[in-house]
Structures are given as C-alpha cells and as structure tokens.
C-alpha cells in the first residue's frame, strides 16, 4: 500500500541506487528517480549533544537536512570507499528513503544497486537488513554497472563508471559482469575537486580549505571544468597564454574569483594519477586493460559498446578523450564506439534507470529473492540468485 492516496505506483518495485555521494530512489517503470539526496547521516557533535530534544534536536539527520544543519552535526557518509561500511547509517538512509522520501510501505519488493566486486559478507548483510529490518517481500541486489548497461538497452558492453570516490571499468557479457576483468581506481570526482582546490590555492593564491569551501570548488568544477583532448598542447596554448579560457565565479560572499587553465588541469588526474602522487594507470588504460583481459571472441563487442556512467563522466569532452585514447591503444581494425546519451540524460542516473527498467520486467519477481526463500536458505541465497 502506498501512503500517497493519489499515487498509482504502489504496484511497482522500489528502486534504490545508493551511491557514495547521492542516493537516488523511485519506482520501477518510471523514467527518473522521485528522490535524490546526499548519502550522508549527521549526528549532533560533541558541543551540541547536551541540547534537549524539546528544543528540536534529533538523534540523527539524513540527507539534505543533515547538510543544512552541518554546522552542529558530525557528518558521516556510510558508503565511503576507505571506511568500513556503517550498517546502522545504511539502515537510516534506507528508512529515510522508504518513509520520508517515497512514503511507502514495503509490499512490492525492492531493487538495490551495489558496487562491482562487493564483498560477499556485505551482500549477505544488506540482504539480512532488507528482510529482517524492513520485511520486504522480494529483494534483488544488482551490480550498478550492469544496470547502467541495461539503461542503454544492452546486455553486452563495457561500463566506465566514475562517481565520487572510485572509478570502475566493468566488462559485461550476456548481462553478467566478468569479475576477473574488472579494474578499479580510487580516483574519481572527489579527487578532481580536491586537486582543483589545491591548484587554485597554489596558482591563484586562494584559501579553500573547509568542507563548505570544498562544495564551492565542486560547483566551480561542474560549471567550468572540462577534459583536455590534448593536455600538453592545451597547457601551453595561446588561449592559456592570453587568458582566453578564463572564467569568473562569484563566491557566496559576493567576491569574484578567476579560473583559467585550472579548468582542464584538474580533470587530468583521471588520466594521469601521478599528478596526485598515485602510482596507477589512468582510466583510459584501465578500460583498455579490462577489454584485453576478456576472451578474444567478445572484445569487438566491448570496443563497440562503451558506456560512460557516473557524474564524473559528464565533464565536457570526457567522451571524446576516452575514444581518442582507446583508438591510440587498440588495434586499428577495431571500431571504437562510446555510446552517446539521449538529450538531457544524466550519466549519474544511469544505474537507477537501468534498475527501473529491470524491475519492471515481468520476470523480476521470479528472479528476485522471496521472503520464503530467505527464510529457508538465509542470507547466503544472495550469492546464488543475484550474481
């Protein structure tokens, strides 16, 4: 039963893509998520714990409400890659999705996305939470990159998925990822933002240091950042020398700041991790390595079906840079195709859209785990039914 009487989506599965920065949630069969909010939980910090609940203080805040009150809260992102999963906070985010954002009772099943190479113990724990804490009648856990591929109507291809914390390259054949050929790099959108902070401070004499200022720099990146198609040439180009690429940005206090070559220098960390002292291949090389680690017979289909997913891949010219780099790395006989998005399609929503499509299929209930199966086999059933 849906608590919104005027809503006709109560027959649809609930679809949740809980990323490291944003959580997207909605109903299967719809074109876009109903709710998008920050994947963050805030609790009163030491200085404010003594404030009584009668004065309006809650034990915790989730999502955008936590961001608004961040000055008096200690914020945690439960999906951050470098930290152990905080299951209590995961439960709070899911509770917020069901009862505050979507306002539903859970009687039609849930599809939840997961990261590639998600550890078995994490998969079993979230399965336990869904059945024992939220009492869902059906549950399905799906690789976020596979869902992104589904959003393009494909079962075969390779997904370069770059969100806030990690970039993955995931080859997929007949709707299943190929685990031994998946690569990952702990450089993504957050790394680009932090590098932009660093070079603006060093090159322009600014002093961006706080978390609030980091959000400002993130906004600068999203408004003015782009990927260079020829980094060394652009770095010493006439446009840079004559300040033609400079843009002005107004800070919240009204001060105007200027950004020039930093607009494309920041994104180069994705292709040259050594800029931030990380010894690793760039995202283009990881993509190529994932392809050549697959059987020869399926490589052509991977080269010809490259999907870019995650907000970081929305930086202008990212698509063309990836294509150019792969052309340089690959045999000349191979056709390289990066699948274009439809007008107004948001790369950061692809996993959710794929989940919406998959959960609306007539076979979804049969493919998902039922409450009866969970009661009979326990949480390990996830390893057999969702792979």
Swiss-Prot record:
<comment type="similarity">
    <text>Belongs to the actin family.</text>
</comment>
<keyword id="KW-0067">ATP-binding</keyword>
<keyword id="KW-0206">Cytoskeleton</keyword>
<dbReference type="GO" id="GO:0005737">
    <property type="term" value="C:cytoplasm"/>
</dbReference>
<comment type="function">
    <text>Actins are highly conserved proteins that are involved in various types of cell motility and are ubiquitously expressed in all eukaryotic cells. Multiple isoforms are involved in various cellular functions such as cytoskeleton structure, cell mobility, chromosome movement and muscle contraction.</text>
</comment>
<keyword id="KW-0378">Hydrolase</keyword>
<dbReference type="GO" id="GO:0017022">
    <property type="term" value="F:myosin binding"/>
</dbReference>
<dbReference type="GO" id="GO:0005524">
    <property type="term" value="F:ATP binding"/>
</dbReference>
<dbReference type="InterPro" id="IPR043129">
    <property type="entry name" value="ATPase_NBD"/>
</dbReference>
<dbReference type="InterPro" id="IPR004000">
    <property type="entry name" value="Actin"/>
</dbReference>
<dbReference type="GO" id="GO:0006909">
    <property type="term" value="P:phagocytosis"/>
</dbReference>
<dbReference type="Pfam" id="PF00022">
    <property type="entry name" value="Actin"/>
</dbReference>
<keyword id="KW-0963">Cytoplasm</keyword>
<protein>
    <recommendedName>
        <fullName>Putative actin-29</fullName>
        <ecNumber>3.6.4.-</ecNumber>
    </recommendedName>
</protein>
<dbReference type="GO" id="GO:0016787">
    <property type="term" value="F:hydrolase activity"/>
</dbReference>
<keyword id="KW-0547">Nucleotide-binding</keyword>
<dbReference type="GO" id="GO:0015629">
    <property type="term" value="C:actin cytoskeleton"/>
</dbReference>
<dbReference type="GO" id="GO:0005200">
    <property type="term" value="F:structural constituent of cytoskeleton"/>
</dbReference>
């Amino acid at each position: 039963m849906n608590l919104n009487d005027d809503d006709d989506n109560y027959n649809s599965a609930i679809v949740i893509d809980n990323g490291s920065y944003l959580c997207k949630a909605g109903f299967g069969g719809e074109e876009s998520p109903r709710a998008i909010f920050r994947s963050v939980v805030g609790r009163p910090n030491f200085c404010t714990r003594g404030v009584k609940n009668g004065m309006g203080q809650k034990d915790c805040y989730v999502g955008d409400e936590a961001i608004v009150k961040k000055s008096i809260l200690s914020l945690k992102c439960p999906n951050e890659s470098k930290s152990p999963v905080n299951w209590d906070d995961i439960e709070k985010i899911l509770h917020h999705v069901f009862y505050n954002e979507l306002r539903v009772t859970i009687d039609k099943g849930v599809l939840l996305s997961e990261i590639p190479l998600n550890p078995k113990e994490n998969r079993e724990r979230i399965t336990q939470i869904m059945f024992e804490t939220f009492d869902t009648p059906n549950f399905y856990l799906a690789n976020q990159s596979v869902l992104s591929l589904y959003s393009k109507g494909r079962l075969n291809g390779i997904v370069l998925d770059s969100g806030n914390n990690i970039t993955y390259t995931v080859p997929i054949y007949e709707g299943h990822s190929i685990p031994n050929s998946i690569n990952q790099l702990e450089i993504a959108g957050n790394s680009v933002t932090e590098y932009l902070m660093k070079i603006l401070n060093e090159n322009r004499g600014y002093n961006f240091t706080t978390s609030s200022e980091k959000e400002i720099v993130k906004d600068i990146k999203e408004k003015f950042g782009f990927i260079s198609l020829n980094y060394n040439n652009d770095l010493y180009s006439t446009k840079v020398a004559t300040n033609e690429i400079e843009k002005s940005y107004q800070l919240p206090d009204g001060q105007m700041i200027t950004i020039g070559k930093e607009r494309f220098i920041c994104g180069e960390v994705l292709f040259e991790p050594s800029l931030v002292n990380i010894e690793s291949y760039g995202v283009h090389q990881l993509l190529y390595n994932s392809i050549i680690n697959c059987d020869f017979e399926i490589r052509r289909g991977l080269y010809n079906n490259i999907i870019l997913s995650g907000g970081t891949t929305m930086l202008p010219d990212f698509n063309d840079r990836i294509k150019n780099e792969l052309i340089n790395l690959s045999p000349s006989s191979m056709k390289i195709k990066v699948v274009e998005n439809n007008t107004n399609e948001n790369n950061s929503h692809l996993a959710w859209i794929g989940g919406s499509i998959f959960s609306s299929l007539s076979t979804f209930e049969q493919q998902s785990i039922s409450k009866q199966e969970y009661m009979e086999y326990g949480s390990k059933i996830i390893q057999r039914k969702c792979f």
